[in-house]
Amino acid sequence: MCASNSNPQDFIDLKIRIFPNDASVAGYPVEITLGGQREFQRGRVSADILPWVSSGVPAEDGQRLFDTLLADQVLRDAWAASRESSSRRRIRLRIDADAAELHALPWELLQQGSVMLSAHTDTPFSRYLPIELDWSDPVKERPIRVLVVISDPDDLQAKYDLAPVDVDLERKSLESALSTVGKDELQADFLDAPATPERLEEALRQGMHGGAAGYHVLHFVGHGAFSRRRARSALYMQDEQGRAKRMLDDELVSMLARQGVQPRLVFLSACQSATRSQADAFLGLSPKLVSAGVPAVVSMQDVVTVETARKFGATFYRQLLEHDQVDLAVNEARSTLLTAGRVDAAVPVLFMRMRDGVLFALQEEVEEKVQVSLTGGEGGIKIGGDFSVSGRDSISGKG
């Protein structure tokens, strides 16, 4: 993994917590905490923030959302104080589950002046979900193992009026992004078509054979759907004949939980895969994955163009493998979308339960672990072998 100019310790933690609507204060109480210790006086966001109506101009919406969030003088003062403490702030937005209606707002648009906070290198941004689980240490095993699932059912267009997935193009795009890493650093396996739930589960099992730690990353490319009436999310997988087969959110969560080892990152490059019901903050696919133990989930909160998803994914992986910080990588990938003039740049969303955004150990930590192994210590790992992303065989999912 390449050296990075950015260190997690360079950022000061800034948590913005929004509490449920409180009639006694005519709005939603808001609490800003800096560095995990300095807690500012609570302010409030007016209940008039809902319903949210987009102007159709992302920059205007972002500034309006920012001004509404910090309309209370107490909150403006807290924000100003945080900027005085450090220009580099890791922003974690925590919305209480009982304020679920606020999850539908496009918080990734938040803009102060000319700066979109979720696209600036000084303000890594995430939707933070506090889960009562032990913190996961950064991955020190090498190679980092990625399972890629590209689902292109034959009847997508005829049955659901959805565009076919260009499997070859998607694979080449991912291979290009991942090949920037040394061959001993990362291993990418592509699930063979048809991408059935059964083959996916078998591939996850194979990933833990021989004492391996399982897949660190699960990357899905395809289409998703959300039922507002049923408040359910689904991914379009395939059956054995290659036709569309819906995999419901609970089914995917249960499958991952059964494997014993959760991926550290799930990337859902699927339309609507991050949309959630306003009735319950944890009914969407991404929050369910985080609540089940996945440290970080990148997904889409609305319909997204294929080109946007592709550009975002390629930049995201390059940057993540450069400095190991998932929230910073999302910001950098979003910045690329803005530079390219993509109007849906705010659609990708990061949900995470980590405080510092670090998924993978820094290179010096990995080298230290390898040295322990070479000197006979416990917990060593084997790094080596001939590997190239483009030349690797696919996993078929068969025993």
Short names for language-model regions:
Residues 1-126, 138-140:
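Non-catalytic, solvent-exposed interaction/assembly segments
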Residues 72-83, 128-134, 197-206:
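Short alpha-helical segments and helix-capping/turn motifs at coil-helix boundaries
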Residues 90, 143-144, 261-264, 293-295, ...:
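Short coil/turn connectors at secondary-structure junctions
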Residues 102-110, 157-158, 276-277, 360:
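Short helix/loop capping segments that flank catalytic or ligand/cofactor-binding pockets
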Residues 109, 114, 118-133, 241-261, ...:
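Caspase-like cysteine protease fold
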Residues 124-129, 217-315:
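Catalytic cores of nucleophile-dependent amide-cleaving enzymes
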Residues 135-241, 268:
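A domain-level signal for caspase-like cysteine endopeptidase catalytic cores
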Residues 391-399:
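C-terminal, disordered and strongly charge-biased linear tails with low hydrophobicity
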